[in-house]
């Protein structure tokens, strides 16, 4: 499995319930497995569920599962696991180009580090990666 951290910034939008919401950023981790790619999507804001609906509606992701990672003693970090649907459209090509452009140039070794990244700022996340490399 190879994992790439993608910082994703999404503008104002509407969720599937037609309720307005906004958020500044989502922390996305794209994991490539033999069976296909998975996207771990984390939102630090209270509107995370609506963010997930908006992301699945906008980007053609299928919300398949939720996962909780132990980021610190007594504290869990919520991720949503999104499976990428095959997209034989121009939208798919744009998404592929977007992911290539947005990817960081480092890899993450363990899901524990991903949990640490989700609850820390960018500099701390980089330090976590440096420690495991």
From Swiss-Prot:
Domain of life: Eukaryota
One GO CC annotation: cytosol
UniProt-recorded name of the protein: Uncharacterized protein C22F8.03c
Native source species: Schizosaccharomyces pombe (strain 972 / ATCC 24843) (Fission yeast)
């Amino acid at each position: 499995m190879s994992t790439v951290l993608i910082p994703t910034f999404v503008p104002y939008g509407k969720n599937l319930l037609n309720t307005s919401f906004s958020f500044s950023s989502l922390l996305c981790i794209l994991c490539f497995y033999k069976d296909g790619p998975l996207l771990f999507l984390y939102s630090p804001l209270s509107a995370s569920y609506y963010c997930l609906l908006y992301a699945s509606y906008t980007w053609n992701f299928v919300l398949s599962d939720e996962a909780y990672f132990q980021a610190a003693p007594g504290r869990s970090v919520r991720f949503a696991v999104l499976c990428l649907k095959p997209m034989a459209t121009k939208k798919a090509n744009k998404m592929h180009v977007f992911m290539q452009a947005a990817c960081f140039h480092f890899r993450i070794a363990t899901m524990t580090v991903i949990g640490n990244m989700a609850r820390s700022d960018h500099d701390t996340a980089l330090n976590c990666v440096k420690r495991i490399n």
